[in-house]
Each structure stands twice: as C-alpha cells, then as structure tokens.
Amino acid sequence: MQATKIIDGFHLVGAIDWNSRDFHGYTLSPMGTTYNAYLVEDEKTTLFDTVKAEYKGELLCGIASVIDPKKIDYLVIQHLELDHAGALPALIEACQPEKIFTSSLGQKAMESHFHYKDWPVQVVKHGETLSLGKRTVTFYETRMLHWPDSMVSWFADEKVLISNDIFGQNIAASERFSDQIPVHTLERAMREYYANIVNPYAPQTLKAIETLVGAGVAPEFICPDHGVIFRGADQCTFAVQKYVEYAEQKPTNKVVIFYDSMWHSTEKMARVLAESFRDEGCTVKLMWCKACHHSQIMSEISDAGAVIVGSPTHNNGILPYVAGTLQYIKGLRPQNKIGGAFGSFGWSGESTKVLAEWLTGMGFDMPATPVKVKNVPTHADYEQLKTMAQTIARALKAKLAA
C-alpha cells in the first residue's frame, strides 16, 4: 500500500479492509473499513497507531513508501483495541523505537494485551505536549470514546487532529478524503458507526468536544483511525456538528417498527401499524428482525422519536431474534424515545407484557396500551392498532413541540 500525503510531513499509512462485513463481531460494515495509522516526519519521526495484526505487512509497506521504517523514532498508541494496536509487536521489532507513548490507562491495557517486559513505554498526561522537532503535539484523553484508554493527538500549528476512533466511519474506498465521498454516504456511515459503537457514551462525547473546543482545538484536518480523513475547516466543522447532533439524541418524527413473526399474524399487525403511522404524518421504517441485522435496526433507531416492537408469545416470552435485538439496543442506551408494543398469541399471551417491560426498562415513554391479538387479527384488532398509532403519534408530536 502506498502512503497518502495529507500535508507536508504527514502521511496516512495503514490498510484497507475491503472484505470486512462484520465489524468487531457485533455490527455490520457493509462498505468494508480501514485501519488508519499516521506517519509524521520530523526530527523525531513518529507513527500514530498501528493496524490489525494481519495487516502489518501493508502498514510496513506504506511506511516504506515514505521512509525506512527503521527511521521511526517514536510510536504513539492512542487506543489498545487490536484493530489499532494489533501490529504493535511487529512495529516494535521492525522499528526499534526510542519511546512508545500512551495514556496511563493505555499502559495498563498494553500490559494486559501484550505482557511485554522491556518495551520503552512512557505515559503521557491529559494536556501534555511533546516536541518532535519542528512540530509539537498535544495529547488529550478522551476516556470512553470508546475505551477507557482512548486519547487524541493535536498539532496546533498544522491544525491536524489525529482523532483515533472519534469521527470514524466504516468505509473502504480508494478515495481517502471526506470531500471525495458523497455527503449522504459519509453521513450515513458516520451515523452507523456512532450509533453502534459510541452511542452509550453520549455524555462523554459532548464533554470531550467541549474540552477540545475549550482548549482551542479547531482542526482543518481530522484524521480518524477508520474511514476517510476530513479535509478542510468546513468538513471538520461538519464532523463535529454531526457528533454533537448524534450525542444529543434529539427525537424526530420518525417511527421505527421492528418485529418477528411465526405465522404472519404479528407481521400483519406490524404492517397495519406502519400504514397508520404514515397516515399520522410520521416517517416510518418497518424492519423484520430476520431480514435486518440488529446493528441496522439500531442505526435507524438512533434518529427516531418512537420505537415500536412486536413479537408473538413464545414459551411465555418473546421470539429470540426480538430478544437479542432488544438486548443489543439496551446496551447502546438510546435516549428520548417513545415506545410501543404489540403481538399475537395462541394461549398464554405474555409477549406484549415482556416487550413493555423491556422498553420501560430502557427509559422509553409508553403512552399507549400494548395491543395483543389471539391467533389471527380481525378488523376490530386493526382498529385498536390504528388507535395505538394515533396515541403514540400525538405523544411524539407533543414531545417534538416541547
């Protein structure tokens, strides 16, 4: 892989994972992804982050297209997750760096991942600066974005922010800059990444942005460890504003309905609800759990105002695809949502109670009584569903107007 020049002395190195579709084992990456590392040439030439271990050869080739890897003096490891630090042992062997800089929690994570004995590790503190020669870098801890060890690196004179996982997207492309990607594609990839990885840490996101802005960080280049680089002040402002928007989790007039069904009764109910919400002027997304991955459902929920869940009763509970999706969503802590529950049953009928408990447990408002139907829905049942949709739509409109 050839390095990509960002500005004089700054190069993107790393690897493109064209085949990635299962990112971190729990979320889809339908466009693939990248593992970005950044080479900064100076009196102390420094590599920021590495790549997954299996891509170490591509990383070394990228570095070698700029300089001999043995000329690297420093390594900065901003985050120890193995898609960014997996190639660290190979880099240490190839480069023999004078020092390896990381956060205090990064040092602990490095020890527990690699069990090293004699690496030249040096801890840097929040706000600490390091001179590389002509250039100076400042480190800022960004804990829980999205690991405890996370930090970013800021070059004030060059206005370059190496942001680690923050502002990342799962995009594998020959284009390496944000202004080369259609804005709707970029924004969707950013939202999917944030919703499925960073969303539990929305308060930390807002705090980190406040801290960085307060420290005078106003980048013209944002260099994340996944996806494309944001190039230009306007592009960087776009990225920051989107993160604030995602973290604030303000509701919209969008309703997501997800469900599973055995003999189509719950599916019929879901379709009636979708049409009823549309009649109320809502934007509707109807998602069958067997056709839609849980991360796709969460991506749609991230900017929705209401989430309606359906399942038939199964062994006094709910179907496993619905249960798994709810468990996944709960861990991501969506806020400011209205909920609703529906489902069919044969004899015991507990599913709607279980669904309502899930949604209430996630802090969702529940303005409408769940609707349950014995076996196959009738016209009267459909009228109940329409009433449910009207009640939730009114509550959503009131929430948006507040």
Curated annotation (Swiss-Prot):
Keywords: Electron transport, Flavoprotein, FMN, Iron, Metal-binding, Oxidoreductase, Transport. GO terms for molecular function: electron transfer activity; FMN binding; metal ion binding; oxidoreductase activity. Residues 30-216 are annotated as: Zinc metallo-hydrolase. One of its GO terms (biological process) is respiratory electron transport chain. Fe cation 1 binds at H79, E81, H146, D165. Transmembrane segments: none annotated. Homodimer. In the N-terminal section; belongs to the zinc metallo-hydrolase group 3 family. This is Rubredoxin-oxygen oxidoreductase. The gene is roo.
